[in-house]
């Protein structure tokens, strides 16, 4: 039996994403993992960072990839399946590459569970909308929104991957000490990796021209932007020689 688009869950899911982003800004507290594990969740049960990131990110790849697997195979299929393929590409990297290379601190299980639920819900929302609800004209591939959006997505993903590489090189295996990131966009901002991912999802929202993607981009801006702000404040307090001209997220501005 074919699946038909139901707008109510799409609207509810999009509203939930936007609300979560707004709540993150309202409370303005750092999430209790990474740099903030010891101060915010000292007694939490934890998993090794690699296992935790793998488990958390996995549903963001598996759920939409499973939806895509049921669609007709073609190199350049309908725009919706190509766009969902970009989403899957990001989370393939996060699940199978980033998680296996990260050298972060042990991860609190409570945040792993929250992240897992979020990733599953968001993966289902984006996949369901694009495959069963989205309608694009045949000329969407030549539309400026698609072209510019895909360009921003690829640019942001490149910035994100390169910035993560710089951060990994700051530590030897087993180290948990902090050093000042140098190079790439870290020359200008403390949250270069977060900026890259925000650019990705803004590009994705533009390319898909969809409410769920816009809501996810808004959530990413709020959540990752706030995390960049807290990282910047952390670095400024920890290092007396931290570059004075470096901003938190947006070069020369914020």
Swiss-Prot record:
- Determine if Zinc is one of this entry's keywords: no
Q: Which cellular component terms (GO) are annotated to the entry?
A: endoplasmic reticulum membrane
Q: Which GO terms describe its molecular function?
A: 3-oxo-5-alpha-steroid 4-dehydrogenase (NADP+) activity; testosterone dehydrogenase [NAD(P)+] activity
Please state the Enzyme Commission number of this protein. 1.3.1.22
Protein topology in the membrane: Multi-pass membrane protein
Keywords tagged on the record:
Differentiation, Endoplasmic reticulum, Lipid metabolism, Membrane, Microsome, NADP, Oxidoreductase, Sexual differentiation, Transmembrane, Transmembrane helix
Q: Major place of localization?
A: membrane
Q: What is this protein's function?
A: Converts testosterone (T) into 5-alpha-dihydrotestosterone (DHT) and progesterone or corticosterone into their corresponding 5-alpha-3-oxosteroids. It plays a central role in sexual differentiation and androgen physiology.
For this entry, the protein name equals 3-oxo-5-alpha-steroid 4-dehydrogenase 2
Please tell me the species this chain comes from.
Sus scrofa (Pig)
**Name of the gene encoding the protein in the UniProt record:** SRD5A2
